[in-house]
Amino acid sequence: MEDDAPMNLCNEQFEEIEDSPIDDNDNESFYNADGDVELEEEEVHETPKNFKNGGRFKTNMTNPKVNDLTTIEEKNEDLRSAASSRSASRPASVMSDKSFSSQFEFQSGGENAIEEYTNQVFADENKADLLFPETSKFMNGASPPKDKHHSWEPSIHHYDKQPPPDIQTNSPVFGNLNHRKNKLIPQARAKPGANDNEIVERDNDENVPTTSDKSAFITSPMNSTNHDEKTSTPKRPTNRKIGQYQGPNFDLSSIYVGSPQHQNTSISTGQQMPTSSYSHAHSETMMTNQTINESMVRRVLNGNNKNQDLFAALEEARKRRAAQPSKPDFRINTTRTRVPIKPTSARHSGNVVSSTSNDNTTAASSKDLTTSRKAMETFRQNASMADATNSNTASMTSILSTISTARTDISRSSRNHGGGFSNTSVSTVIPANNGNVSLSHGRDGRDSVSSVRTMSRASSTSTVYAGSTFSGVSKPLRIHAKRVAFGCVAVGETLRVEVEVENISDRQCLVRASTDSTTPVYQILDNKLTMVDPKKSIKFQVSFSPSSVGRYQVIMSIEVPAQNFIHKIPMWGNGGIAKFVPTSPDLQQTINQSEYAMCTSCAKRISFKISNSAGTRDGFAMIKVFDSAMRQLPDGCVAFFPAPGFIVKKKSDKRVDIRIDSSYIDLHDENNFRTSSSLSTASTTSSFQRRILPGAKFFVHVVWGEETMRTRLRLLEVRTGQHQLIDGHDFTSFQFSDEEVLRAVPVGFPAIKPEDRDLFAASYRSFFINFFTSTTEFRAATSRKKKEICSNDDSTLLETTAFRNQTFVNDVTIVPNTRFSNRK
């Protein structure tokens, strides 16, 4: 290489380039590696310890993720490699220019200019430790350098207008904070003799709490800014370099619920709190100030917190809310008057319809009730004897029903005497069975077009009041029914009752009625939401339509939402009934569906069957025999098989044999000659049907019903200790054939109440069988039936039953049997 090589790299001319070959004998290389190492050790610049406040970049409004932050590590390299490393990071557009002079913006100066430029590049004041200074908040727990215009957290003090706050440092709150702030200084910083290397490692360890000079959250949010004494301008902290920013300090340790500050109470356990209220406020809001770093966030997110089922949490919250006591009602009742307490005898005089009164009533009330019943029985016997000799009077059963109604009215008047019921009385709404309502199978043998039983036998729906004595706050409504009992209803049929509600307040009430079940068996037929005027009353119609054989129990709620008033009424009913029908080859039905006629050659022996094949429940039957004068045969003159009272199982029948003494038959023929003809003059279209057909020698009265209702009557008699007579009939004094042993009411069954007596009276039925010894009289009675039916060519019978709410019209119009000639 004789000629000098042209080298215009830095616009300079080198004097000489040694390009002679290397001598093989020279052991040392041209490149001295040890010299380079020594050069690096001499010229290395240590990174300042407190590099978190360094940086020449302003903060960004968004917080980048920790994993996405790129850290640039600066190292001092040899001058020969510095230019190449710098040029490697330059853009491609800049590197496309081969002239280094255009990049460094100087044309002359030589090697000294390059060194000066390099020193400026690597100067401490121009060094960027991190590409994004925001990462210092996540890496070392320190807040990023910010100014008041680019800070994402709200400023506590206005830097220009707000005067310095007057903080009472002697307050127990701030005094406690300052005391705890001093406690946060680690012990390693308090010992001056500690190793410096250990201190540096603690500074770089994120798990070790930072000191007060490095923590951005160590001071209270209330006194984090220092102010100048002369002006209100905030004074920046002095432990920073010029050109670096530091925003207001704040505490985040108590914001997050899962923060370790809520679990670690070791710092404040040794302090004595002034009051319990201050301790509660301190534990929830004034938590210890501590720097939040990455490891703390990781422990919170990946701690021992277990996932909880949402439904389980909601159920637990519902149970806690249900366990809370109800809100007290602080309304002042200015119209409430104190009613004096009545004597015990007067308060318990109405125990016939009271379900919650004491079972052991006083002797006075029992004596009065017994006397009243004896008087009624005497009146019944006298009326029966008078009816036997008077052809224009009503039948015996009608008289007994009238007597029972009178006895009920007397009992009702005694209950209402003295201000009505007490607050412990209970009235049960039951289906009615009075003169205006009839049964399809002839309870008392009367027919009617009425189709709905709406009132109880004791008129508890419309006349029995719930009482005038109230405990506590006055109630806006007076509900006369405390319980609704439907009894036994046939499957597929419907029975309706009415529940009366009266507004006793001085303003309108929006009343809502509902049931606690969605079953269609019980339905409220009227509007479920009704406005009731003051001092007015309404009636809710409730229907019971059983779909299968069984017992149905629901709760009906009547409430006034605006006044937080609610009244619950239990309702129960049985699906399925017994259906008794007499069967015999010689038996024929008369015009009345509950009356039959039968011809027998011997009056001393009467035999027939009672069938319950169409019934779905067990039933009972009780038999009584009367002569043509409507006198009941004495027990010594008649015998029954299997017994006067017996049980017929469902889907079965039972044969009945009756034996009459011959001596009574002869006596009856002599004494009954004149009365039999007079009884035949009674009108067949009268509302009170005769119980014996003209020419009949005897008639049998069969009373029947569901055995489950008679069992409740027996339990009521055991509970009250009083004998129960229903319309003069005794259903409990003797043992019925095939009846079961009386047991206590099982748990969950409707409770035995005094109203079960009225429910039984409204549910039992009966039919009559007329016995003829002469075929001529028997044919006359049956032909009279056909003649009465054919007397009106357009006669329609309306069949009704107490167990229906619809009227079934059976077209039994008889068309005369006439022959029409064929016209050609």
Swiss-Prot record:
GO aspect biological process, one term: centrosome cycle
UniProt biased composition (Acidic residues): 16-27, 35-44
Entry keywords, A to Z: Cell cycle, Coiled coil, Cytoplasm, Cytoskeleton, Developmental protein
Membrane spanning stretches: none
Cytoplasm listed as a keyword: yes
Keyword Mitochondrion on entry: no
CC annotations in GO: centriole; centrosome; cytoplasm; pericentriolar material
Subcellular location: Cytoplasm, Cytoskeleton, Microtubule organizing center, Centrosome, Centriole; Cytoplasm, Cytoskeleton, Microtubule organizing center, Centrosome
InterPro entries xrefs: Cep192_Spd-2-like_dom, Ig-like_fold
Described function: Required both for centrosome duplication and maturation. Required for pericentriolar material (PCM) recruitment.
Name of the protein: Spindle-defective protein 2
Organism: Caenorhabditis elegans
Taxonomic classification: Eukaryota, Metazoa, Ecdysozoa, Nematoda, Chromadorea
Gene name of this polypeptide: spd-2
